[in-house]
Amino acid sequence: MVDKFELPKWLLRGIEESFPLRNFDQTLSSKINDANKSKSKLRVKLGIDPTGTDIHLGHSILFKKLRAFQDNGHVAVLIIGDFTAQIGDPTGKNKTRVQLSEEEVKENSKTYLNQLGMGKSSDKSILDFDSEDRIEIRYNSEWLKNLNLNSIIELMGSATVSQMLAKEEFNKRYNSQTPIALHEFLYPLLQGYDSVAVNSDIELGGTDQKFNIAIGRDLQRHFKQEPQYGILLPILTGLDGIKKMSKSESNTVGLSEDSLSMYSKLEKVPDNIIPSYFELLTELDLTLLKDNNPRDLQRRMALEVTSLYHGKEEALRAQSNCEKLFLGLKEKVGEIPIISLKEIVFPVKFFYLLSSLNLFKSSSESKRSIKGGGVKIDSYKLVNPDLVFDSKEDLSGKILQIGKKIIKRFDN
């Protein structure tokens, strides 16, 4: 729930929830207003664990909101979880994560900061790295690697096992007798301690981070600090229109992708996710969603997002090139052999679908080809063989390409 009638417009857009509604008899909106009146700067924390090499549009929602705080005079406290990344956030995982090496985490951290625009002027970067009084980059190894056993025991003593088991992922694993490593219980406490270390006023996170942010509030209270507010933003649905945007689902748009790739992916998103992409990825007026056909909205949204990361001129060039490719394909679409979905029982896994259609000799061959990047649908390279298609409508009319030779069009 959000105190929607009071929050400033620049902050309100896209927020799913803010909590608590009151903190020491003060609302989040009044805290922001008081800070603005007194010209004091709020410390707004966003933590990222560099567990991969790419930042995608799903991540960008949080960075855009952090930038909004910067543009309104507050301090972005960007925490690079170089220590916690070696543990791995158990949120959304049904098994223990593989731990990363220190070198892997360091390399990933560099690529993250480059993608966020470090070294670029503020008008060309996602975060404002130019205004030194509005950015603070911290690595949580600064304080976490020096914690002694007494400090760790104090942290662990501030929470209970029942609290930890209230976390959805832990609860599911406990009930299904799937192992939970003890170090995983430490993760929310260490992330929460980050809030103590930087004395944050507000923490940003996805809706899946509410538990961890709440632990941060508890720890700040334990260490005699004023507890932070939490601001939660939605988890972006991926290009398939079904599952959350995730590299493992092959449904992402990376910030480092070239303009043509970015535009061509975005202009094909399913109709059901156009409104959320408009709201979360652009600053376009949401009234445009009324009385406009989906195709026009797709193009408008794709152009706006591509412009944000590549500039207007480059985005227009990508749009033009994409339309030329589309027209060329449209002329040939009647020549593409049709492959019928009539005999397929849905829902169906991607690898099984292809082997059932006799496009591969076996399921294992199908899996290998998909994992190797040899299969595309509507120009998207899908690398997850276990991707599930729920109905014929997910595929009907789409073009399947296997390698360079096999091109077919799905039909009901």
Swiss-Prot record:
Q: Where is this motif: 'KMSKS' region?
A: 244-248
Transcription found in the keyword field: no
For this protein, the Enzyme Commission number is: 6.1.1.1
Intracellular or extracellular location(s): Cytoplasm
Family that this chain belongs to: Belongs to the class-I aminoacyl-tRNA synthetase family. TyrS type 2 subfamily.
Give the matching HAMAP family. Answer: Tyr_tRNA_synth_type2
What's the protein here called? Tyrosine--tRNA ligase
